Structure formats: C-alpha cells, structure tokens
C-alpha cells in the first residue's frame, strides 16, 4: 500500500441501530431524508411566489408521491439493473432494503410514474409538473453520493492522481478515484446551479425537464469512465450506467428540441 495516498477511516454506515437488529438510521438514509427536506423547502418557496400555479398542499402531495416513486423505483431498479441474478436465486432479496442500494435510473422511472399520477389527479399538464420537479432533484442526488462515500461504496477505478484515496474495505487497498465525490459535485452542485439559473429566464414548457435529463446523463456518463463498474461492460465499450444514460441524453435532447419548436408556449 502506498502511504502517499489518503487512507480513509472505516466509517460505520449506521448512525444507530435498535439492539442487535438491522433496524436503525443509516447515513445513506439520512442523506435521502435531508434531500427531501431541502426539496420541500425549495418547492414551498417557489409555490408561494405570485402566479406560481401551485399550492402548498399540491406540493406536499407531489413530494409524497415522488418519495414513494424514488424509494420503490430505486430499489426495484437496483435489483433488476444490477442484481438480477441474486433476485432470481432469492426473490425475497427485493424486500431486504438494508442489504442493497438504490438505482438512480430506477428511481427516475418511479418519479416519472409519480409525476404522471400527480398530474392526472391535479388536472395539470405533465410537463408543468416535470419542470417544477427537475430543479428540486440535484441537491438530493449530491447528498446521496456523499452517503455512498460514507458507506465506502461505489468507489472509482485505480489511479495515481494526487487526490486518490484508499478505501479500507477494498481487498486490494489500491489508490482510487473518489468517484462518489465527483458525482456529488457534478450531478449535485453543478446541475443544481445550472437548472436554477435556467428557470429564472424565459423558456418553453418541458425545457427544464429536458435540460435535467441531458445534464445528469452527460455528467454520469463522464464519471462512469473513472468509476469501478458494478457489472460487466456492454460489448466491452461502455458500462451499464453509461448504457442507461444514453436514452436520457437522447430523450432530453429530443424534449428540448420539441419544447423550443413550440414558440407559443414560452414561460416568463
């Protein structure tokens, strides 16, 4: 082991547990909770602006549905995108949430379903809902990646860059990219800043949602080059995460082009 690199301490992923059980509060869960608290604060702040088109009750309903979509979709996505073999051998693994992670792409699908339902129940245009939700997401994503870092999971590939870190649960104890922190910065702080500047300017409906898809897809695709793959690459060229990001980038670009072609639907 090279002593020139930072050796991280072995963080306990649990803040506390109840007795000898696996029930308790984990840092990863706390980060998700803080992300939703911040999202509600920001959403209520925007809803209280004149002519926002939203009430606080509608925001709370939207966020509750979104929370369920993230939790259910994220868990199901993690199982089916990354741990399908484990699930086929042991179907109850799907319900042991304390043993697995959360997939962003699965969570995104869950949020889309939640937005469709919320839009229908509130008799609202889906793209109005999607544009309202998109700027709320990145901050929570950034906190989630910090949770991954504390959990000492989803680390990067081996490297010799000066800021490389050695993760104590890595059997090889190799210096690696802290890819979780790269994602926290790009998918969290940078994407949050871009979207919240963009919504302050005149724009067509659906463009905010399209920009989110492009931004997340591009940032995640880039970081995947230095992130240790969880599963085999596709055709030895791209990772599973990159393959899942390509439809986001293409879909986001299509939505942006479609939105700007509808010149009569500019939001000021």
From Swiss-Prot:
Positions of transmembrane segments: 23-43, 62-82, 97-117, 132-152, 179-199, 206-226, 241-261
Keyword annotations of the record: Cell inner membrane, Cell membrane, Membrane, Transferase, Transmembrane, Transmembrane helix
Acetylation as UniProt keyword: no
CC terms in the record's Gene Ontology section: plasma membrane
Protein known as: Phosphatidylglycerol--prolipoprotein diacylglyceryl transferase
Record family assignment: Belongs to the Lgt family.
Localization, UniProt: Cell inner membrane
Listed InterPro entries: Lgt
Enzyme class: transferase
Upper classification of the organism: Bacteria, Pseudomonadati, Pseudomonadota, Gammaproteobacteria, Pasteurellales
One GO BP annotation of this record: lipoprotein biosynthetic process
UniProt-recorded Gene Ontology molecular function terms: phosphatidylglycerol-prolipoprotein diacylglyceryl transferase activity
Gene from which the chain derives: lgt
UniProt-annotated binding residues for a 1,2-diacyl-sn-glycero-3-phospho-(1'-sn-glycerol): 145
Record membrane topology: Multi-pass membrane protein
């Amino acid at each position: 082991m090279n002593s020139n690199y930072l050796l991280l301490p072995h963080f306990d992923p649990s803040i506390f547990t109840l007795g000898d059980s696996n029930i308790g509060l984990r840092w990863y869960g706390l980060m998700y909770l803080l992300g939703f608290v911040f999202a509600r604060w920001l959403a209520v702040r925007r809803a209280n602006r004149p002519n926002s088109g939203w009430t606080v009750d509608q925001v709370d309903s939207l966020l509750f549905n979104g929370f369920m979509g993230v939790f259910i979709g994220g868990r199901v996505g993690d199982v089916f995108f990354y741990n399908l073999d484990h699930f086929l051998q042991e179907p109850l693994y799907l319900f042991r949430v304390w043993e697995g992670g959360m997939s962003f792409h699965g969570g995104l699908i869950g949020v889309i379903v939640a937005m469709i339902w919320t839009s229908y129940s509130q008799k609202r245009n889906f793209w109005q809902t999607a544009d309202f939700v998109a700027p709320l997401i990145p901050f929570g994503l950034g906190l989630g990646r910090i949770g991954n870092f504390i959990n000492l999971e989803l680390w990067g590939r081996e490297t010799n860059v000066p800021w490389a870190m050695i993760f104590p649960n890595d059997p090889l104890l190799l210096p690696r990219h802290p890819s979780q922190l790269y994602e926290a910065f790009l998918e969290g702080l940078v994407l949050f800043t871009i979207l919240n500047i963009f919504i302050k300017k005149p724009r067509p409906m659906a463009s905010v949602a399209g920009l989110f898809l492009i931004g997340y897809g591009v940032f995640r695709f880039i970081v995947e080059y230095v992130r240790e793959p969880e599963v085999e690459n596709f055709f030895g060229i791209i990772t599973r995460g990159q393959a899942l990001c390509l439809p986001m980038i293409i879909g986001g670009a299509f939505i942006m082009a479609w939105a700007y072609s509808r010149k009569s639907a500019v939001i000021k």
